[in-house]
Amino acid sequence: MDQPMKPKTCSESDFADDSSASSSSSSGQNLRGAEMVVEVKKEAVCSQKAEREKLRRDKLKEQFLELGNALDPNRPKSDKASVLTDTIQMLKDVMNQVDRLKAEYETLSQESRELIQEKSELREEKATLKSDIEILNAQYQHRIKTMVPWVPHYSYHIPFVAITQGQSSFIPYSASVNPLTEQQASVQQHSSSSADASMKQDSKIKPLDLDLMMNSNHSGQGNDQKDDVRLKLELKIHASSLAQQDVSGKEKKVSLTTTASSSNSYSLSQAVQDSSPGTVNDMLKP
């Protein structure tokens, strides 16, 4: 009926189950740790690979830059350092140009100030000159109003003495203001001198005739001497008439050539004066 209860005892199977459970837990932990180690190793390998790739690319880039510089040295650089250096150089050039332009502006402004000052001085000088010109014009007008009119100048002829012995070709020159009036005066002088010469010849012939007649009457000589005296008188009268005809012809020529120079008029008057004493001397000879 009722059986007594027996105590439970651990058998080998129980021990086996416990060991299996503990081993499974430890194996799971080992697997997790191995996975973590594998992941860390993978990450390290990837980083190393990226670094190696970067180094390779940098090396290739440097090689390509060297090759490009060797092929085309004027080719613009595209790296950051070259760009920065180029910009810095450009800024320096721009600053130098700005300084140069500032210096030029200063010099030009100084020159402009000097020119403005000179322009003002020239304006002042122009104003003073204008005032001086106005004053001089006023003085000139005043003098013209108060000035006495000048008497017109009359040209007088220069007298000269005719040389009878050793006639020279020298003719005195008289500078005159009005040559027409001088020519008219020379013609009048020539006509007056010729008229005086003819009057002198007539006055000299008449006393000679009277003297000859008186001498012929008082001498008491014959008719032969009277005839000789008459012939001499006729010859002298004929010579005087020829001289008068020459003088009248020369006067006509002078009247036709009124536009001739003063030297020709003087030479004609000299010729007339030279001829008239010769005729008188011829008449006075016995």
UniProtKB/Swiss-Prot annotation:
Keyword set, alphabetical order: DNA-binding, Nucleus, Transcription, Transcription regulation
GO cellular component term of the entry, any: cytoplasm
Protein's UniProt keywords contain Methyltransferase: no
GO biological process: intracellular iron ion homeostasis
Record-linked SUPFAM superfamilies: HLH, helix-loop-helix DNA-binding domain
Tissue: Expressed consitutively in roots, leaves, stems, and flowers.
Domain annotation bHLH: ranges: 44-94
Pfam families per record: bHLH_IRO3
Region (Disordered): 1-34, 182-202, 244-286
Source domain of life: Eukaryota
Biased segments, Low complexity type: 18-27, 183-198, 255-269
PROSITE patterns linked to this entry: BHLH
Alphabetized GO MF terms: DNA binding; DNA-binding transcription factor activity; protein dimerization activity
Compartment(s) where it occurs, according to its Swiss-Prot or TrEMBL record: Nucleus
Polar residues bias: start-end ranges: 270-279
CDD domains, sorted: bHLH_AtILR3_like (cd11446)
Family matches, as InterPro entries: bHLH11/121 (IPR044579), bHLH_dom (IPR011598), HLH_DNA-bd_sf (IPR036638)
Disulfide bonds: none
Main location: nucleus
Quaternary structure (record): Homodimer.
Annotated protein name in UniProt: Transcription factor bHLH11
Organism: Arabidopsis thaliana (Mouse-ear cress)
Gene that this sequence comes from: BHLH11
